[in-house]
Amino acid sequence: KPGHGGVLPAAKITPEIAAIRGVPMGQDCVSPARHSCFSTPVGLLEQVARMREASGGKPAGFKLCIGHQWEFMAICKAMLATGITPDFIVVDGKEGGTGAAPLEFMDHVGMPLRDGLSFVHNALVGIGLRDRVRIGASGKITSAFDMARVLALGADWCNAARGFMFAVGCIQAQSCHTGECPTGVATQD
């Protein structure tokens, strides 16, 4: 959820999830809206470098939805200053998101995918790093046309989940977080 982080309700926490996430059974698992390891663009890039090193050189990057354009430009400036570039950036549109997000946030926080993707692509071209950073696109991609459009706007690949959610029966009841999904897509009991 934009600006809110994520919440996995206690009812959905299995012993396996509790062990992996380090949370007690019977308690909501709250993921903060920001990462505790960094708070600046330079810190973000240093975290990307640490992840790449810890994984033995596997690709490392980050996902974002463009809010204020100057914030991404600060990341671009940090890339130039540090020489650290992510292997990839996934641009999410405000149209994406979760059924647990408040409607006001889903409709009014962040840039639409087309605008955000075009901005990120053009910014990376402008600073001369587009050839070093791959761009993924996500957010309400449901058709072949949606895929072709984001590829034409500069994406190297796209993530498409919504169409698959519909295929397995999602009716967008926006109750994913309640543990009472009417079609069972977000509830496996």
Predicted features along the sequence, with ranges:
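Flexible glycine-/small-residue-enriched beta->alpha junction loops
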Residues: 1-26
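Glycine-rich phosphate/ribose-binding loops and adjacent secondary-structure elements
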Residues: 35-189
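Short glycine/proline- and acidic residue-enriched helix-loop micro-motifs
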Residues: 26-34
